[in-house]
Amino acid sequence: MTENSYKTPCGCIHYFVNIIDKQKITLVFLPGLTADHRLFEKQIEYFEKKQNVLVWDAPSHALSRPFTNNYSLSDMAEWLYEIIAKEEIYNPIIIGQSMGGYLAQMYMELYPDKIKGFISIDSAPLQKSYMTAVEIWLLERAEPLYKIYPWKVLLRAGSRGCAETDYGQNLMRKMMMSYDSDPEEYARLAGFGYRMLAEAIKADLPYHISCPALLICGEKDKAGSAKSYNKKWHQREGLPIKWIKNAGHNSNTDQPDE
């Protein structure tokens, strides 16, 4: 994998890419909020010699810092599109975990004919019709909750809440430790991410799935209403769904072989 970067007005995005054949499918991996490229290390290890792959550290995360938290989900989708164009990727399948899945939906909203497939991992629909007013209100006010908890408590809750296996929990803890020198940065990032998500939902855009799609969700996903959303998404849109046994919110780390 080669590390590359892309400059934006808010900061520099770092990503890793390995292109074998530009005409073939490229797997584009998008980690969730507060996670980074390491979330997909098992998938990259498996696919990098077989498929074109790209994975990024999202803006304001890990290597993509410092970064000014003054952008929207549509800005992120535009930057992702520009990175994909820069790397001459013509046939992307976008695989988004949690917030990465929301970003993939925004990308489809802006560039419906520039995507070949979408895989949602423990994410949920961006359409406003799925959300209650209370849920949106809570998203906008998450930051103070993160600031209340001592960092050690957050570390424990974050790793155990996202994963069921030792590997998954240790990996989440490792990614969270990127913010160990400034836990308030972690709280600001989480709060900003949830507010950005709320704004995208309130925009009430169609967020039509414009390509073949697959929903993946851990049977033990405890993050918000992820399981409930995925059931409704599957029922309303007719999207195929795969439930992962013994897996939490980061199901791809709990059961990578599935």
Residue ranges and their predicted role:
Residues 1-12:
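N-terminal cap/lid segment of alpha/beta-hydrolase-fold proteins
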Residues 14-66:
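Conserved HGGG/HGGXW glycine-rich cap/lid loop of the alpha/beta-hydrolase fold
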Residues 42, 106-110:
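Active-site signature of alpha/beta-hydrolase-fold catalytic machinery across serine-
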Residues 109, 116-148:
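Flexible "cap/lid" loop of the alpha/beta hydrolase fold
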Residues 210-247, 253:
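Conserved loop-alpha-helix segment in the C-terminal half of the alpha/beta-hydrolase fold
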Residues 96-100, 104:
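Gly/Ala-rich beta-loop-alpha elbow adjacent to hydrolase catalytic centers
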Residues 129-131, 148-208:
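Conserved alpha/beta-hydrolase catalytic His-Asp/Glu region
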Residues 54-95:
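Active-site loop/oxyanion-hole signature of alpha/beta-hydrolase fold enzymes
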